[in-house]
Curated annotation (Swiss-Prot):
Protein name: Beta-galactosidase
GO terms, molecular function: beta-galactosidase activity; carbohydrate binding
The protein's enzyme class: hydrolase
Entry-linked SUPFAM superfamilies: (Trans)glycosidases, beta-Galactosidase/glucuronidase domain, Galactose mutarotase-like, Galactose-binding domain-like
PROSITE patterns: GLYCOSYL_HYDROL_F2_1, GLYCOSYL_HYDROL_F2_2
Organism expressing this protein natively: Kluyveromyces lactis (strain ATCC 8585 / CBS 2359 / DSM 70799 / NBRC 1267 / NRRL Y-1140 / WM37)
Length: 1025
C-alpha cells in the first residue's frame, strides 16, 4: 500500500538533504544578491495535488498569482490562501507522531534569476534561505537540489551544477506540516511560507572563506590582557595568504540611530583608519592562529565596545580575492562561585522574552521594525533578551552586539502539545515546579526521550551554535522551551559543550539542571523561589548554580503586578540573577472587525478564535509589555522604573544615590534637582556604591550627560521622589447664611440653598440630581451608588474573576431600610442618612450600611460605614466605592496624586506624584478590553464643569482611587472597537481596589494587595467652587 504522506515529511531522522554544513553568518554585498520580491505562487490542498516541480516551466508558473517574499501565505489580502491559527499549549492537528496530516497545504513558489558567462566562470553559486515554515524542497532548472526542515534556521544549497548562463528557474515547494511540526509548537501563530530572506550567493571559485570562528579569552585573573583566537576555513587552494587586521575599537558610547544601524546591516560598514593589530598567515601555514592583545577594552551590555576586523584572502598576484568585515567583543563568560559572570563580574538580567512579530507581516519582520524594538528596550532600561523560542534572523545579532544586550539564544524546539492531553485527562493540580516533573516525566517519551528524534534535536543545537557563535552578546545557549526533558536534551548539551565550551547552557525543562549550567524557573511564587534557594545553598551561603527566571511577570493585559517585589528579591540574594518578562509584545494581527458597538468595520487586532479556528488558545497571545503595534503599555513603563540601574531615595533632608549597574560608574549621568532645576554634585560611584547628600529636594532625576548608543543626551535613566504627606487643598467651608429649603417627600428628599440643589431617591438610596449654580453636576443614569465591581483583567480570569462571579459580586443590590433627613448644625444645611443592606442575589452575606450626607452651602461630606455580616462570604472584592454620573456640563479633570498613567496597588512604582490635567493625558487602551485607567494615591481631584465651576474631592486621612470614563460594556467587548460609549462620563470614586497581579500565567495577587472581605469605613468631601 502506498503512503499518501511523502517520506521526507514523516521521517524525523531525515532533517535535510544536500544542505551545506552550517557556518558562521556574515554579510557581504559582493557575495549576496537578494532574491526577495515578487515570486509566482500557487497553493494546493496537499503534496499529492501540487505539480511536479521537475516538470514545471516558467511559462506556466508566471501565470499564477504573485506573492511577496518574505511573507506568510496566510497573511495575504483577503486571507485568500487560508487564515492564521493560534495555539499555545495544544497542537492544531491530530497527534499522530511522526505523521503530519494527509491534507497538508503546499505552497509552490517560483522565480527566475539571470547569470552571465563571467559569473558562471568566476563564482560558485549557492541559494540561501534564512527561514521557511515548515519544510521545503528546492529545485533549480527542473532538477532536484535538496530538502530542509527547521523553520527558524537558515540553510544553504550548492546549485553550481544546476545553473547555466542566462535565465535560471528556482522552484520551492513548501509544506505546512511535517514530523518537525511536533517539535515547533511555540506559543505563537501558525504561519507558513518563505518568511525570511532568500539570497543568491556568489563565492569566488578559485578560493573563498567558508567559515570563521573568532574567540576571546582573558589570560590573567584580572581580565586585563587577552588572547584572540581566529580559525579560518578556506575552500579552494588558489590563494597565497590571509591577512587579518584588527582596528581600534569603537567604544560603547558610539552614537547610533535607526538609519545608521540599518545602513551598517546592509553592508555599508565604516572602519577606523587606525589599525590596532595586523597579522598574516601563509597558505601552507595553519589557518587557525592566536593573537595576544594587550589590555583590550571589554565588551559588556553596559559598555558594548566592539573591535572591527577585516579578513582578506589574498591571491598570488596580491589582489584581494575576498574580504570579510565584522566585529569582535572581548568578553569572557564563566560560572564562578555559583554565579554567571562576564569578565569576572556577576551580572543581573533585566530582561524580556522576544518573539518575532509584526501586526501585519507576522514573523516576516522587517529589520527596521526590529531596530525600533531594540531602541525601545534600551530606552526602558532593558539589558537582556531571550530569543523565545528560536534563533532570530542572523542580522539581529549584530544589533544586539552594537547596542549592548545579554542574549540567551534558543534552539528552535518546543513540544508543548504532547503535555496537553495528559493535563486535560488528569486535571493535574500541583505546585510548580512539581507540575514540571510530573508533566515532563510522563510525556517525554513521545519526543524528547524518543531516539527517533535525536537527529532532529542535535541538528537544531548545532545550527544554533555554528551560525551565531561569533557574537559577543550571546552568553548563553538554550536547549529550547517546554519540551519535557529527555535523552535528546542530554545529547544536545553534550554536543553544544563540544562545539562551544566558552558559553553556558540553559534549559528550564531540566528542573535539576543536569544538562544545564543554571537553574531556571517560570512564574514561581516567592515562597517557591526561597525554598529552592535554601535547598541549594550550604550553611556558608555558597551554591553551585544560580537561579534565573526565564519567564516571569506575565504581561497579559493590565499588569504585571508586584514587579517591585521580584526585583527586591533579586537584589537581596546573589543566588538570583534576574529574569526575563514574558513577553515583549502582543502578537495581535491587524484585521477588520465588525464592531458590536456600532455595527461598522473597524481596525482591530486578532487573537485566537478571530479566524474561526477549530482549536485555539484565545487571547493568551496578547501578553506583552507592548501592544500589537509594539508601543509601550503601562506595564513597560512600570518595568522601566522597577529595573532602573540607579536608585535615588529621598528622605529626611537628604538624597541617597546607589549605583546598581554591574560594570560602569555613574560618570555618564547628571543628577538634577527637579525642584530647582539645578544639577546635584554627585561623586563617581562604582557598582553597588552609595552616597548620601544633604538636600531639601523632593524630586531628583538621573539623565544622560551625552548621547550614548541610541539614547540622546538628557534621556532619563532613573528618578526618585520623596514620600509626600497628604496634601488636602485649602478649602473654606461656607456657613449657611439662611436655612435651606428641605423637602422630605414620599419618594425624594431635596435640600436646596442659593447655590446648591441636592435630590436623593429614597427608594433607591441614590443621588437623583446634584446641581450647582443651576448646572447638573451629577444625575441619575442607571443609578449612582456604592459599587464593588470592575471589569475583569486578563490576570483576574483564572481565579479572582471566577470567585467574584461565584459570589455574585457583580449582582450586589442595595435594599433601603430607611432614609432620614435632619436640619443641619455647626454650619451645615442638612444631614440625610440612608440605612440599607447591600448584598448579592442568592447569598447570605452583605453589608449593613449607613451613608450620611452632611450638606453645606458649598460642599457635601459623605460618610460611609459598612459592616460585613452573613455566612459564606467571598475572600475578597474587586473594589469598593461610589459611582457618580457626571452631568452634561462636564469638561475635564485634574488631580494631585500618582500619574500621569494608570496605577494600581501593586503596579504604581512608575507613576510620579504631581498635579495632572486630563487634557494632557491620554488613557491607555488595551488591545483586549479590560479594567484600566485607575489612579491610586490621589490626594485630591478637581472636576471642571462648564458654567458651574469645579467639584473638588478629597478623602480625610488617606489617599483614594478614582477613574473617569465614558466606557461601558467592557466586560463583553472582544476588541477595543467593541467598547461602547455612553456619550457622557461617570466618576468611579474608590476607597480601595484589588491589585492586578500576573495570575493569567503566574502567581496570584500578593496578600498585601488583595482587597479582603472586611468592614469598610470611609468618607469623602465633595466641595464646590
Amino acid at each position: 500500500m502506498s503512503c499518501l504522506i511523502p517520506e521526507n515529511l514523516r521521517n524525523p531522522k531525515k532533517v535535510h538533504e544536500n544542505r551545506l554544513p552550517t557556518r558562521a553568518y556574515y554579510y557581504d554585498q559582493d557575495i549576496f544578491e537578494s532574491l526577495n520580491g515578487p515570486w509566482a505562487f500557487a497553493l494546493f490542498d496537499a503534496p499529492l495535488d501540487a505539480p511536479d516541480a521537475k516538470n514545471l516551466d516558467w511559462e506556466t508558473a508566471k501565470k499564477w498569482s504573485t506573492i511577496s517574499v518574505p511573507s506568510h501565505w496566510e497573511l495575504q489580502e483577503d486571507w485568500k490562501y487560508g487564515k492564521p491559527i493560534y495555539t499555545n499549549v495544544q497542537y492544531p492537528i491530530p497527534i499522530d507522531i511522526p505523521n503530519p496530516p494527509t491534507v497538508n497545504p503546499t505552497g509552490v513558489y517560483a522565480r527566475t534569476f539571470e547569470l552571465d558567462s563571467k559569473s558562471i566562470e568566476s563564482f560558485e553559486h549557492r541559494l540561501r534561505f534564512e527561514g521557511v515554515d515548515n519544510c521545503y524542497e528546492l529545485y533549480v532548472n527542473g532538477q532536484y537540489v535538496g530538502f530542509n526542515k527547521g523553520s527558524r534556521n537558515g540553510a544553504e544549497f550548492d546549485i553550481q551544477k544546476y545553473v547555466s548562463e542566462g535565465e535560471n528557474l528556482v522552484v520551492v515547494k513548501v509544506f505546512k506540516w511535517s514530523d518537525s511540526t511536533y517539535i515547533e509548537d511555540q506559543d505563537q501563530w501558525w504561519l507558513s511560507g518563505i518568511y525570511r530572506d532568500v539570497s543568491l550567493l556568489k563565492l569566488p571559485k578559485k578560493a573563498h572563506i567558508e567559515d570563521v570562528r573568532v574567540t576571546t579569552t582573558f589570560v590573567d585573573s584580572q581580565y586585563q590582557d587577552a588572547e584572540l583566537s581566529v580559525k579560518v576555513d578556506v575552500q579552494g587552494s588558489s590563494y597565497d595568504h590571509i591577512n587579518f587586521t584588527l582596528y581600534e575599537p569603537e567604544d560603547g558610547s558610539k552614537v547610533y540611530d535607526a538609519s545608521s544601524l540599518l545602513n551598517e546591516e546592509n553592508g555599508n560598514t565604516t572602519f577606523s583608519t587606525k589599525e590596532f593589530i595586523s597579522f598574516s598567515t601563509k597558505k601552507n601555514e595553519e589557518t587557525a592562529f592566536k593573537i595576544n592583545v594587550k589590555a583590550p577594552e571589554h565588551w559588556t551590555a553596559e559598555n558594548p565596545t566592539l573591535y572591527k576586523y577585516q579578513l582578506d584572502l589574498i591571491g598570488s598576484d596580491g589582489s584581494v580575492i575576498q574580504s570579510i568585515k565584522h566585529h569582535v567583543g572581548f568578553r569572557q563568560v564563566e560560572l564562578k562561585d555559583g554565579n554567571i559572570t562576564v569578565n569576572g563580574k556577576d551580572i543581573l538580567f533585566r530582561g524580556v522574552n522576544r518573539h518575532d512579530h509584526h501586526p501585519r507581516f507576522g514573523r516576516a519582520v522587517p529589520l527596521d521594525f526590529v531596530v525600533r524594538d531594540l531602541i525601545l528596550m534600551k530606552k526602558f532600561n532593558i539589558n537582556a533578551v531571550r530569543n523565545s523560542h528560536y534563533p532570530n534572523h542572523p542580522k539581529v545579532y549584530d544589533l544586539f552586539d552594537k547596542l549592548g544586550f545579554w542574549v540567551i539564544d534558543e534552539a528552535d524546539l518546543e513540544t508543548h502539545g504532547v503535555q496537553e492531553p495528559f493535563n486535560r485527562h488528569t486535571n493535574l493540580e500541583a505546585e510548580y515546579p512539581d507540575t514540571k516533573n510530573k508533566l515532563y516525566d510522563v510525556n517525554a517519551h513521545y519526543l524528547s526521550d524518543n531516539p527517533e528524534y535525536e537527529v532532529a534535536y542535535l541538528d537544531r543545537a548545532s545550527q544554533l551554535v555554528l551560525r551565531d557563535v561569533n557574537h559577543p552578546s550571546i552568553i548563553i545557549w538554550s536547549l529550547g522551551n517546554e519540551a519535557c526533558y529527555g535523552r535528546n536534551h542530554k545529547a544536545m548539551y553534550k554536543l553544544i559543550k563540544q562545539l562551544d565550551p566558552t558559553r553556558l547552557v540553559h534549559y528550564e525543562g531540566d528542573l535539576n539542571a543536569l544538562s544545564a549550567d543554571i537553574f531556571s524557573f517560570m512564574y514561581p511564587t516567592f515562597e517557591i523561589m526561597e525554598r529552592w534557594r535554601k535547598n541549594h545553598t550550604d550553611e556558608n551561603g555558597k551554591f553551585e548554580k544560580p537561579l534565573i527566571l526565564c519567564e516571569y511577570g506575565h504581561a497579559m493585559g493590565n499588569g504585571p503586578g508586584s514587579l517591585k517585589e521580584y526585583q527586591e528579591l533579586f537584589y537581596k540574594e546573589k543566588f538570583y540573577q534576574g529574569g526575563f518578562i514574558w513577553e515583549w509584545a502582543n502578537h495581535g494581527i491587524e484585521f477588520e472587525d465588525v464592531s458590536t458597538a456600532d455595527g461598522k468595520l473597524h481596525k482591530a487586532y486578532a487573537y485566537g478564535g478571530d479566524f474561526k479556528e477549530e482549536v485555539h488558545d484565545g487571547v493568551f497571545i496578547m501578553d506583552g509589555l507592548c501592544n500589537s503595534e509594539h508601543n509601550p503599555t503601562p506595564g513597560l513603563v512600570e518595568y522601566k522604573k522597577v529595573i532602573e540601574p540607579v536608585h535615588i531615595k529621598i528622605a529626611h533632608g537628604s538624597v541617597t544615590i546607589t549605583n546598581k549597574h554591574d560594570f560602569i560608574t555613574t560618570d555618564h549621568l547628571l543628577f538634577i534637582d527637579k525642584d530647582t532645576g539645578k544639577t546635584i554634585d554627585v561623586p563617581s560611584l562604582k557598582p553597588e556604591e552609595s552616597v548620601t547628600i544633604p538636600s531639601d529636594t523632593t524630586y531628583v532625576v538621573a539623565v544622560l550627560k551625552d548621547d550614548a548608543g541610541v539614547l540622546k543626551a538628557g534621556h532619563e535613566i532613573a528618578w526618585g521622589q520623596a514620600e509626600l504627606p497628604l496634601k488636602v487643598p485649602d478649602f473654606v467651608t461656607e456657613t449657611a447664611e439662611k436655612a435651606a429649603k428641605i423637602n422630605d417627600g414620599k419618594r425624594y428628599v431635596s435640600v436646596e440653598s442659593s447655590g446648591l440643589h441636592f435630590i436623593l431617591d429614597k427608594l433607591l438610596g441614590k443621588i437623583e440630581s446634584l446641581k450647582v449654580k443651576g448646572k447638573e453636576i451629577s444625575s441619575k443614569f442607571e443609578g449612582s451608588s456604592i459599587t464593588f465591581w470592575r471589569p475583569p483583567t486578563n490576570n483576574d480570569e483564572p481565579r479572582d474573576f471566577k470567585n467574584w462571579k461565584k459570589y455574585n459580586i457583580d449582582l450586589m443590590k442595595q435594599n433601603i431600610h430607611g432614609v432620614s433627613v435632619e436640619k443641619g448644625s455647626n454650619g451645615s444645611l442638612a444631614v440625610v442618612t440612608v440605612n440599607s443592606r447591600i448584598s448579592p442575589v442568592v447569598f447570605y452575606y452583605g453589608f449593613e450600611t449607613v451613608q450620611k450626607y452632611t450638606i453645606f452651602a458649598n460642599k457635601i461630606n459623605l460618610n460611609t460605614s459598612m459592616k460585613l455580616t452573613g455566612e459564606y462570604q467571598p475572600p475578597d472584592f474587586p473594589r469598593v466605592g461610589y459611582e457618580f454620573w457626571l452631568g452634561d456640563s462636564y469638561e475635564s479633570f485634574e488631580w494631585l496624586g500618582r500619574g500621569p498613567g494608570e496605577s494600581y496597588p501593586d503596579k504604581k512604582e512608575s507613576q510620579r506624584f504631581g498635579l495632572y490635567d486630563s487634557k494632557d493625558v491620554e488613557e491607555f487602551v488595551y488591545d483586549y478590553p479590560q479594567e484600566n485607567g485607575n489612579h491610586t494615591d490621589t490626594h485630591f481631584l478637581n472636576i471642571k464643569f462648564e458654567g458651574a465651576g469645579k467639584l473638588s474631592i478629597f478623602q480625610k486621612e488617606k489617599p483614594f482611587n478614582f477613574k473617569i470614563s465614558d466606557e461601558y460594556g467592557v466586560d463583553e467587548a472582544a476588541h477595543a472597537c467593541d467598547v461602547k460609549r455612553y456619550g457622557r462620563h461617570y466618576l468611579r470614586l474608590d476607597h480601595a481596589i484589588h491589585g492586578v497581579g500576573s495570575e493569567a500565567c503566574g502567581p496570584a495577587v500578593l496578600d498585601q494587595y488583595r482587597l479582603k472581605a472586611q468592614d469598610f469605613n470611609f468618607e469623602f468631601d465633595l466641595a464646590f467652587e
